[in-house]
Amino acid sequence: MQITFLGTSSGVPTRSRNVSSVALRLPQRAEVWLFDCGEATQHQILRSDVRLSQIRRIFITHMHGDHIFGLMGLLASCGLAGNVSRMDIYGPPGLNKYLEACQRYSQTHFSYPIRVHTVQPGVIYEDEEFTVSCTALHHRVTAFGYRVSEKDRPGRFDVQQAVALGIPSGPLYGQLKRGEQVTLADGRVIHGQQLCAPPELGRKLAYCTDTIYCEGAVELAQDVDVLIHEATFAHQDADMAYQRLHSTSTMAAQVALAAAAKRLFLTHFSPRYAPGNDLQIDNLLEEARAIFAPTELAYDFLTYELPRHLEPERQTLSVG
């Protein structure tokens, strides 16, 4: 699981930051899941290691232009390239009508099926590896945050130890690999976890924008490995944050702290903090770290790989 930030500015692009988009790269299945798709996202993709042909799912947080104005162009380009078999898009009410209107008035024909899912709080997608859920955030329009949870993977089965214990190969191996308890012909009871390496714990990611501090964001981000949270304003500009229902850097840090997240990436910065201004983005980082130390500033094309975690060492089983 790799995160690539394709746009980290709020509202409008700047010389160094495009508007919102984050790519979640899943190399094990040759897929990319996109979160938001602001203007020029496909241009950002061309400048990155993300492959347009691998985009399989797109998750839209809300209907403001800096999060959706790149969507129609990206979908059209995928069709012209001819190497996308299907696209699933998830987002708030109105997203489907928006895309239908764009397609109708531009007379764009998609050569592949597109399915738009109108989301509601709860689980919105699940397969054998991942679960994606969403919850409502607090913004001027309907907005949702997303959480991606990777399922735990069983540890490697120790065939050599199984042979040394005299366990016959066949169906018993399958049961033990699944962690089940089996009874051998001689009466010995073997527990599957005693022959398997520690499971790999599934990794978790939460994406929260646009929103002011809210309990929904805290709930969504519980115990995640990475929280990506908007930080449109500095703490001294909190009045504007409350007026526009955006977060300050300190609000984002408070969400991460309350949720016991492992790492926080700030994004969606107002252009008012660009280099040369009295208050700059580095000041937002200082504010956040005073509350939640493992905080980083996102920037365009930053890539971060979520680390894997193992459960405590398994109990060893002696031979003899």
Swiss-Prot record:
InterPro entries cross-referenced by the UniProt entry: Metallo-B-lactamas (IPR001279), RibonucZ/Hydroxyglut_hydro (IPR036866), RNase_Z/BN (IPR013471)
Catalysis: reaction(s): Endonucleolytic cleavage of RNA, removing extra 3' nucleotides from tRNA precursor, generating 3' termini of tRNAs. A 3'-hydroxy group is left at the tRNA terminus and a 5'-phosphoryl group is left at the trailer molecule
Gene3D superfamilies cross-referenced by the UniProt entry: Ribonuclease Z/Hydroxyacylglutathione hydrolase-like (3.60.15.10)
EC numbers on record: 3.1.26.11
Cofactors that this protein relies on: Zn(2+)
CDD domains: RNaseZ_ZiPD-like_MBL-fold
Active site residues according to the UniProt entry: 66 (proton acceptor)
Top-tier EC class: hydrolase
Keywords: Endonuclease, Hydrolase, Metal-binding, Nuclease, tRNA processing, Zinc
Residues the record lists as binding Zn(2+) 1: 62, 64, 139, 210
Binding positions (Zn(2+) 2): 66-67, 210, 268
MF terms in GO: 3'-tRNA processing endoribonuclease activity; zinc ion binding
Cofactor: record remark: Binds 2 Zn(2+) ions.
Task performed by this protein: Zinc phosphodiesterase, which displays some tRNA 3'-processing endonuclease activity. Probably involved in tRNA maturation, by removing a 3'-trailer from precursor tRNA.
Family in the record: Belongs to the RNase Z family.
Protein name, per record: Ribonuclease Z
Organism: Cyanothece sp. (strain PCC 7425 / ATCC 29141)
